């Protein structure tokens, strides 16, 4: 069941950041290891506090998956490695598409699994940037549906 986290507490933001890192270490093999601490700080200090957060909890009341949105854009979607392949990502994306009007997402070009996931969800590439927003050499695909 999708739940909106209104005003997440610091311990919840920490738990989401930990989930982010576990997920990234499995799915973002193209990242330079030294970039992970930089992005982790950015996620915890900037991205999560700025986003409207939706979660799916695991059986122990922790987080199995989460997404963050801003306006009509999906800003982030991460699933715990142990919860991958169970439809949680699809459930989260469909929830915010229906209830929040989300229709845009950016994805790392090197993340073929995520690009394929979004293509199966009906997203199409509308543009590409050679660098990510922090100026690093991780091309970004801008998708819409």
Over which residues does each language-model region extend?
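A short helix-loop-beta-strand connector motif used in the catalytic cores of GNAT acetyltransferases and
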Residues: 44-55, 73, 136
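Conserved GNAT-fold acetyl-CoA-binding loop/helix
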Residues: 18-44
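Conserved GNAT acetyl-CoA-binding A-motif
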Residues: 98-110
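Conserved catalytic-core motifs of GNAT/GCN5-like acyltransferases
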Residues: 106-108, 124-140
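Conserved beta-hairpin
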Residues: 51-67
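A short beta-loop-alpha structural element at the N-terminal edge
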Residues: 1-18
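A short, internal acetyl-CoA/4′-phosphopantetheine-binding micro-motif in the GNAT/acyltransferase core
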Residues: 73-84, 108
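Conserved acetyl-CoA-binding loop-helix of GNAT-fold acetyltransferases
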Residues: 85-98, 116-120
């Amino acid at each position: 069941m999708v739940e909106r986290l209104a005003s997440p507490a610091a311990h919840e933001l920490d738990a989401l950041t930990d989930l982010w890192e576990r997920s990234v270490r499995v799915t973002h093999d193209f990242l330079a290891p030294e970039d992970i601490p930089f992005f982790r700080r950015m996620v915890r200090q900037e991205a999560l506090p700025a986003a409207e957060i939706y979660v799916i909890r695991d059986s122990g009341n922790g987080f199995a998956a989460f997404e963050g949105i801003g306006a009509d854009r999906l800003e982030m979607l991460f699933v715990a490695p142990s919860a991958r392949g169970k439809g949680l990502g699809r459930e989260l994306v469909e929830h915010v598409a229906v209830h929040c009007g989300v229709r845009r997402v950016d994805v790392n070009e090197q993340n073929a699994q995520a690009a394929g996931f979004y293509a199966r969800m009906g997203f199409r590439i509308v543009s590409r940037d050679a660098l990510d927003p922090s100026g690093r050499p991780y091309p970004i695909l801008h998708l819409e549906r």
